[in-house]
């Protein structure tokens, strides 16, 4: 099944909300988001990072707003970027009220630490007045004290109870413009909690494995946990939490969605791990191609196979395929196109991929124009 094949996954039906100009839930594509790790009060640095995230394809960006100074900085940041911004609020509900005045696109509050119900009501009233959605963000590391006492330790049931407590509160306030997350650093706990929650409510679900780890370990945990849920049709937005450059979170997020045929963006590489049969350096070729072609957004399959054992079969299924041989053979749309030697192999392959991407983009645009 290639990247342009339809996904067999039947997604959970959920209510559609809007985060700025981005639809979330319903029949909307699964949104990929990240979070800045700059000092929010450093407006220039935060804006620069958000723009990098936009360039990487981020649909939504979350920004931590720990105090009133950060709230004022948030307002300045909002004026300088195009992507919808979520304000991450903890402890002081008045910060949420201020960023609502400054044009925030979504408010993320943690029910375990935002305070009394009257404070939650004040935030809801401000959100309702300005049509701002709220994300109820439940986290295993910050459950309410009474739930910690009741369950003794974080459990899927504790996460669900925390979430439903605040869902019920919003229901009583007749506020339905919200999404929910129930995150944990343990994959099985998070997956179980999301499964329970998905059966209870119709609101969109924001998926994440919190504090997943560094680039490698966090990618693996997130791919396993989110992959399980997404394959079951659960999830409307995702965030890959990595102790790394936030841009990597966007890349990994799209790679997970591409692997499940839930969303297509950029090149889907098919490459062999290489062995002594290879007729060119597959690893070096792949590393160079991935770096050079990061800017391409057109959904494409590109196969890079080092020998003739699996090469022709994989290459014929790709938009552009390279099979190792003497000389190497390039396939375009499944048909043999030209032979390449190892001299300037990457340069020529990049040229052919970009040429095919331009043709495909033009054809896709023409198809859309015809309706």
From Swiss-Prot:
Cofactor(s) it depends on: [4Fe-4S] cluster
Enzyme Commission (EC) number: 1.17.7.3
Residue numbers binding [4Fe-4S] cluster: 272, 275, 307, 314
Gene Ontology annotations of biological process type: isopentenyl diphosphate biosynthetic process, methylerythritol 4-phosphate pathway; terpenoid biosynthetic process
InterPro entries membership: Dihydropteroate_synth-like_sf, IspG_bac, IspG_bac-typ, NO2/SO3_Rdtase_4Fe4S_sf
Catalytic activity: (2E)-4-hydroxy-3-methylbut-2-enyl diphosphate + oxidized [flavodoxin] + H2O + 2 H(+) = 2-C-methyl-D-erythritol 2,4-cyclic diphosphate + reduced [flavodoxin]
Cofactor-binding details, from the entry: Binds 1 [4Fe-4S] cluster.
Single GO MF descriptor: 4-hydroxy-3-methylbut-2-en-1-yl diphosphate synthase activity (ferredoxin)
Protein role: Converts 2C-methyl-D-erythritol 2,4-cyclodiphosphate (ME-2,4cPP) into 1-hydroxy-2-methyl-2-(E)-butenyl 4-diphosphate.
Identification of the protein by name: 4-hydroxy-3-methylbut-2-en-1-yl diphosphate synthase (flavodoxin)
Source organism per UniProt: Pseudomonas aeruginosa (strain ATCC 15692 / DSM 22644 / CIP 104116 / JCM 14847 / LMG 12228 / 1C / PRS 101 / PAO1)
Lineage, top ranks: Bacteria, Pseudomonadati, Pseudomonadota, Gammaproteobacteria, Pseudomonadales
This protein's encoding gene: ispG
